[in-house]
Amino acid sequence: MAQVKRIRRSISGILVLDKPRGMSSNQALQKVRWLLNAEKAGHTGSLDPLATGVLPLCFGEATKFSQYLLDADKGYETVMRMGITTTTGDAEGEMLAEREVTVGRDDLEQALPRFRGDIEQVPPMYSALKKDGQPLYKLARAGEVVEREARSVTITRLDLLSFEPPCATLAVSCSKGTYVRTLVEDLGQVLGCGAHVAALRRTQAGPFVLAQAITLETLERVHAEGGPEALDQFLMPEDSGLLHWPVLQLSEHSAYYWLHGQPVRAPEAPKFGWLRVQDHTGRFIGIGEVTDDGRIAPRRLIRS
């Protein structure tokens, strides 16, 4: 008997998942996509399998705006294990070296300021960055080490939350592209004892925070009770990740032309920058950019 093809639902919105430990970001995405029976899905930047916490998942039309969440600042809490370095910079790697930890709380507090602000980081070998088309982590697994260029990142917060040797818990707020594993390794090197990430929890991704995140267990329970449609209650609007942008409401006439790809004028628009655009009813219809001549050019549109 032929297998009946599952008809997926055309739904749109953002679901903020509290990713469980031990699952890749893509595995988490595919699991939630299956629960929602969603036609189109994408995530907004990978979390290591070891990490837990905020992972915004985009469905349907919301996937058009996932890039802007990829570029957003992130927040983390990490447990730094001093005295042990590993091949991967976290607890999943093999131990490279072990040293005695004689670091005190004051030593750690005094080391933190040099890592705040704009700093240079060399990306780890165990990362998804590519060298000549090959992901670095694949080269690392083959025993290769290649030269990586340092990258500029910004650490806006780096605070000590608790100190229980050989572990310390840190709060980190940082720009996109920051590797907390590298931050912890570099900090361990400055302290003279080495260190790795024993645990990592993302507390924020752009405007989304941990309090908004739904656990996989909750999604599975609600799905078991009410099916895919019961999970729609957890979907946020497509522009939820862009609420820090100015909003512009167009007249019915202007919205018609704008949705057909034509730049329009709006007296109340700002003089420059990106905008969330609504039609005359207040419905989000896409994002636009103010051009040099003051018109609002459509950049990404919502399919009605």
Curated annotation (Swiss-Prot):
One of the protein's GO biological processes: mRNA pseudouridine synthesis
Active-site annotation: 48
InterPro entries: PsdUridine_synth_cat_dom_sf, PsdUridine_synth_N, PUA-like_sf, PUA_sf, tRNA_psdUridine_synth_TruB, tRNA_sdUridine_synth_fam1_C, TruB_C
Chemical reaction(s) catalysed: uridine(55) in tRNA = pseudouridine(55) in tRNA
Keyword Methyltransferase: no
Gene3D superfamilies reported for this sequence: Pseudouridine synthase, PUA domain
Any Pfam family matching the protein: TruB_N
Root EC class: isomerase
Keywords: Isomerase, tRNA processing
EC number, UniProt record: 5.4.99.25
GO molecular function, one term: RNA binding
Protein family (similarity comment): Belongs to the pseudouridine synthase TruB family. Type 1 subfamily.
NCBIfam families: TruB
Record HAMAP family: TruB_bact (MF_01080)
PANTHER family recorded: PSEUDOURIDYLATE SYNTHASE TRUB1, TRNA-PSEUDOURIDINE SYNTHASE
Role this protein plays: Responsible for synthesis of pseudouridine from uracil-55 in the psi GC loop of transfer RNAs.
UniProt protein name: tRNA pseudouridine synthase B
The organism of origin for this protein: Pseudomonas paraeruginosa (strain DSM 24068 / PA7) (Pseudomonas aeruginosa (strain PA7))
